[in-house]
Amino acid sequence: MDNRTNIYAQQLSKLIQCETISCDHQPDKTKFYEFQKLLRQMFPAIFEKCIFEDFHGSFLMKWQGKSEAAPILLMNHQDVVEAPGAWKYPPFSGTIADRKLWGRGTLDTKGGLWAMLQAANELAETDFVPQNDIYFMSGCNEETDGSGAEEISAELQKRGIRFKMVLDEGGMIMHEPIGGASGTYAMVGVGEKGCVDLKFVARSTGGHAATPGKDTPLVRLGKFMAAVEKSSIFKADITPAVVQMFKKVSATMKQPLKFVLGHPILFKPLLLKVIPSVSATAGAMLKTTLAFTMASASEGFNVLPQEAWVIGNMRFSHHQGEKESIHAVKKLAAKFDIETVVLEPGFASPVSDYNSEPFHTIENGISTVFPGVITSPYVMTGASDCRFMSRVSDHCFRFAPFQITDKQMDSIHGLDENIDLKALAPAVDFYKYMMTEA
């Protein structure tokens, strides 16, 4: 390990050791302020150059530039999800082993936050002054409701600030992102599906389990969930961003896939049928999805519930939208005498132009730091803080400059989250490019 990589690994390890777990409606932000104190100690030069503002644990920093031109905003959140299960190394130990750094947040997204501020700090140490203002933003509750980012977005709107470009977490650099694509791709999110939580409630008079009768609340919910799995209530379509993604990945495919994906409109019916079985991620880009995540019924082994419910996490597509997607599933639920309750309304972010100058700046940064890597737009199926920034910029993109494996991708929100040590320095170099060229 070279000296630069060693220093970087030790720094990120310290950040991983701060257990900034995000919890719903958590008023105590002490752990986040302790984390920010560590950031100040680690990156003194950039903190000295910036105006720092606290937003109840989330923060916004402004680095004054030379001109009055539109600024850019770089983002990565501080909070992480919980880390249950049997990990190879303790999830908040920041263990460096096997040429990797292990721990919750290495990829999502303390790694990105560290690389962003490390790049800025190194530039600040040379007395570099950016051409335009650069803002840095970090939310403390991205993993729950994103209210920190929403609050900052609202304040930026009040101030009349519009960003030339916003760059947040998102796609990464992966080999063969879709089966058959033999190249290495940087997947840049140009939009994200909306998210809404729904509660499906089935009721009855209850009773004793010895005489259950038919169509109890749990049975009806089971039939309903099975019907959702089998139904086609959510419309599949290939949006322009996905068309462009298919064309990009087809470049490294062999025939006949190369020709089929290279002409997605011509082969649209075939692709709509085949893609979900080839790639679950690509399949989720084609339509609204509904995943059942929580459930509750009776508290007794021999008691029929008077009320049972399941929670469904819906990610609605741009072409079907929230209102139409909810209406479709509500209509299906009614067939099983199930009430649909919208717990938290959401919104889909607009799709940013992948032919724009800001996108090309990202693409140029990728090709400069990662030679041979192909840049492709895609639609994020998950949610990020970036969705709130579509209110202050027409060019919101989602990309984390780390080269990872499929196994590492699966470790995000799962067991043994880790990052290769060799991925650290290029990430810093990419952020330097963005700060000097955007």
Annotate each predicted stretch with a short phrase.
Residues 52-56, 62, 67, 174-175, ...:
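An extended, acidic, His-containing surface patch that forms the Zn2+-binding/catalytic region
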